[in-house]
């Protein structure tokens, strides 16, 4: 049985003054589905995210959201003042629905689920560490965990593997795939990498003001050339081959615009 969409965007257009940044964008996000939105810098990805999150209204077009939709958002990165005494555990607790909760308060209804998230993302050994001292890959797992704390129906990940090496990307993609399978949430993942995407992605959307193309990723981790360059153990990584429409799409693959 087909479930109702979590978010449906129809014919979205947006401009800042005389500059058009989104042109006739339509997309649908469902539960149990991973959609990867790719495009160069300046393609309109951040603006589209803000519209989907209801932070800004489009110049024209319509966005329909499931009633009471719970959204978890993972930002690209955060900056925490080095002088702030903030542990990983306390950082996660600040994301709870009720500020009186703690991760290990046995009286809360969410305790089991919180423990599951921490265990799933292998954060137990990091809970007492200062948040400022964790590595880039560890921080991404922490941000992902915090986005999951309110049991979202839709998880939006903004550049989740930015600044993470290929091994770290593979591990994070593995966690994201497990989250989709375990919790059944829809996932929208945003990336400026125009070729390398998560293998478990159900659909890739290529944005450059308009949707240039869409399709499925092709696995490349088993190819001899890929293994020679990166080694083995990167089964979560895949390649997306672009098939652009007849409208102008000016980005150069393999490079990002300034």
Curated annotation (Swiss-Prot):
InterPro entries: AAA+_ATPase, ABC_transporter-like_ATP-bd, ABC_transporter-like_CS, Metal_Ion_Import_ABC, P-loop_NTPase. It is a peripheral membrane protein. Its EC number is 7.2.2.20. Residues 7-233 form the ABC transporter domain. It catalyses: Zn(2+)(out) + ATP(in) + H2O(in) = Zn(2+)(in) + ADP(in) + phosphate(in) + H(+)(in). GO terms for molecular function: ABC-type zinc transporter activity; ATP binding; ATP hydrolysis activity. Pfam families: ABC_tran (PF00005). ATP binds at residues 39-46. The keyword Translocase applies. The keyword ATP-binding applies. It is an enzyme of class 7 (translocase). Keywords: ATP-binding, Cell inner membrane, Cell membrane, Ion transport, Membrane, Nucleotide-binding, Translocase, Transport, Zinc, Zinc transport. GO terms for cellular component: plasma membrane. GO terms for biological process: response to zinc ion. It is found in: Cell inner membrane. Its main location: membrane. Part of the ABC transporter complex ZnuABC involved in zinc import. Responsible for energy coupling to the transport system. Belongs to the ABC transporter superfamily. Zinc importer (TC 3.A.1.15.5) family. The complex is composed of two ATP-binding proteins (ZnuC), two transmembrane proteins (ZnuB) and a solute-binding protein (ZnuA). This is Zinc import ATP-binding protein ZnuC. It comes from Hydrogenovibrio crunogenus (strain DSM 25203 / XCL-2). The lineage of its organism: Bacteria, Pseudomonadati, Pseudomonadota, Gammaproteobacteria, Thiotrichales.
């Amino acid at each position: 049985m087909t479930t109702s969409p979590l978010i449906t965007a129809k014919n979205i257009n947006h401009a800042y003054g005389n500059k058009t940044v989104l042109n006739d964008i339509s997309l649908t996000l469902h539960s149990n589905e991973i959609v990867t939105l790719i495009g160069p810098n300046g393609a309109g990805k951040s603006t589209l995210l803000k519209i989907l999150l209801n932070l800004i209204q489009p110049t024209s077009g319509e966005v329909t959201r499931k009633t009471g939709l719970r959204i978890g958002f993972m930002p690209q990165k955060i900056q925490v003042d080095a002088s702030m005494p903030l542990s990983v555990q306390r950082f996660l607790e600040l994301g709870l629905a009720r500020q009186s909760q703690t991760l290990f308060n046995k009286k809360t209804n969410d305790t089991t689920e919180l423990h599951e998230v921490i265990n799933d993302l292998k954060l137990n050994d990091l809970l007492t560490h200062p948040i400022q001292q964790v590595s880039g890959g560890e921080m991404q797992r922490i941000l992902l965990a915090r986005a999951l704390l309110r049991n979202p129906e839709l998880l939006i990940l903004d550049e989740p593997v930015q600044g993470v090496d290929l091994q770290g990307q593979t591990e994070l993609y593995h966690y994201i795939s497990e989250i989709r399978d375990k919790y059944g949430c829809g996932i929208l993942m945003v990336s400026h990498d125009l070729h390398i995407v998560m293998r478990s992605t159900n659909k890739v959307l290529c944005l450059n003001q308009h949707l240039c193309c869409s399709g499925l990723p092709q696995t490349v981790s088993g190819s001899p050339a890929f293994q020679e360059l990166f080694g083995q153990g990167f089964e979560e990584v895949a390649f997306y081959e672009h098939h652009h429409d007849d409208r102008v799409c000016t980005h150069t693959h393999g490079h990002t615009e300034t």
